Amino acid sequence: MSKGALLAMTRSLAVDLGQHGITANAVSTGYTHTDITAHMLSVPEFAERVKNVTAMKRLGRPEDIASVVCFLASDEAEWITGQWIDATGGYKMPPPV
């Protein structure tokens, strides 16, 4: 599914479910150390290249993503819905002008 389609679906869910007090958001994770990315990130040159184009200059950890998801599931985020949360550590952000 493309990013645009996922955002459209997230916003549609937010509108449909909001009347029931249910929020819907999407989280973009970038390169995070998981079983799925292990084969790519085990190549030192690739991992370095990813770090070099990430503002935080490191790869993501599962707990980085978990904290965002836990926040979105908490009462503190009850007014956030229909959003695309970029939890990538600033992956491929354009340099400052």
Give a label for each model feature.
Residues 3, 66:
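Conserved catalytic core of two-component sensor histidine kinases
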Residues 39-54:
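A short C-terminal helix-loop "cap" of Rossmann-like NAD(P)-dependent dehydrogenase/epimerase domains
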Residues 7, 29-39:
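Short, flexible catalytic-loop segment of classical short-chain dehydrogenase/reductase
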Residues 15-19, 78:
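Alpha-helical segment proximal to the catalytic Tyr-Lys
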Residues 2, 10:
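Active-site helix of classical SDR
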Residues 23-33, 73, 86-88:
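Conserved SDR Rossmann-fold cofactor-binding beta-strand/turn motif
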Residues 54-65, 76:
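A conserved structural motif in NAD(P)-dependent oxidoreductases
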Residues 70, 81-97:
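Short C-terminal tail/terminal secondary-structure segment
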